[in-house]
Amino acid sequence: MKKLVLAYSGGLDTSYCAVHLSKDKGFEVHAVSVNTGGFTESEIEEIETNAYKMGVSTYKNIDAIAIFYSKVVKFLIFGNVLKNNTYPLSVSAERIIQAIEIIEYAKSINAEYIAHGSTGAGNDQVRFDMIFQTLAPDIKIITPIRDEKLSRQQEID
């Protein structure tokens, strides 16, 4: 069976990917989420429960809070880099940390494929793809939501 790591948040897009890739496409799906400080323990447990309901073979949560702070957040605070003069401009950098952690995990389990649920809109897809291609050019990227141009309703159905 083809081993695939799925960047998994537990939302609609990544839940669709888990079902589609495991049941329809026959991948051995290993779901992984990266906590950079946005999840509580109970939320991580919910994400894990949902991942298994969606048919994944394994689920792993990577705690990257300390890495995110030491490599990103503290510099945003030091530089007073704010979005709309309100909060640290951290989301784009957060995706980079998440992508690095996910691809390193994929390499550690010898995955042949990696997938994410980003749509064709926005920059998250670029951040994930760029890091994945740079750090593991031999691992094939699969993006069902973007490639199949699915609507939210199609994902639910």
Describe the residue ranges of each PLM region.
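ATP-dependent adenylation/nucleotidyltransferase module used to activate substrates
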Residues: M1-I156
